[in-house]
C-alpha cells in the first residue's frame, strides 16, 4: 500500500529584489491559524518499507486531495492519508481497485464516547490508521530537521521540485542505510 501526505516548504516572502515582487509560482496557505507562503511537497510512501516512491511539488494553495491519486504508483490495493484526503476515492481520477483509509477529522474523533463499544472500536481503528500513517512523516523529518531544508532555494516550482526529487531520493538512502550496510557486510 501507499501512505500519502504533504508538507509546506516556505519561500522567501521578501520583495527586496530587482522586480520588487514575490515568486509568482508560490502561494499562501493556512495551516491551523498560521499563514505560510511557499510550496507544498506531496509524497507517496510505501507502507511496508517507509521509502518514498512518488514526489510532486505544487504551489502552497493546492489542496492535498487534488494530488492524492497522482501519488499512487498503480500497483497498490490500499492507500492511507490524513483527514485532508477525505473524498479522494470519489474524485474523477480515482482508481477503482484502491481502498482509501482516511483518518477521521480530529474534532469528530474527540466527540467519540469511548465507553460505548462502537465508539471504542472506531477509536482503536483510528489509532491503527495513525500508526501506519506515521511512516510518511519520517522523510519529512530527514529533509527538514536532519538537513535543514525548510525554505526553498530557487524561484519557480520546476527547479524546487527537481531538488525535492533529489532530496527525497537521498532520504531513502538515509533511512535504508542500515539495511544497505547489512547487505554489504553479509
Positions of PLM-derived features:
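Helix-centered, glycine/charged polyanion-binding patches within enzymatic domains
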Residues: 77-78, 83-162
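Polybasic low-complexity intrinsically disordered regions
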Residues: 1-96, 105, 165-171, 178-179, ...
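Alpha-helical scaffold segments in soluble metabolic enzymes
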Residues: 138, 142, 168, 172-175
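Intrinsically disordered or highly flexible coil/loop and linker segments, enriched in small
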Residues: 145, 149-152, 175, 179-182, ...
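Acidic, contiguous segments within the catalytic cores of piggyBac-derived transposases
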Residues: 123, 129-131, 167, 174, ...
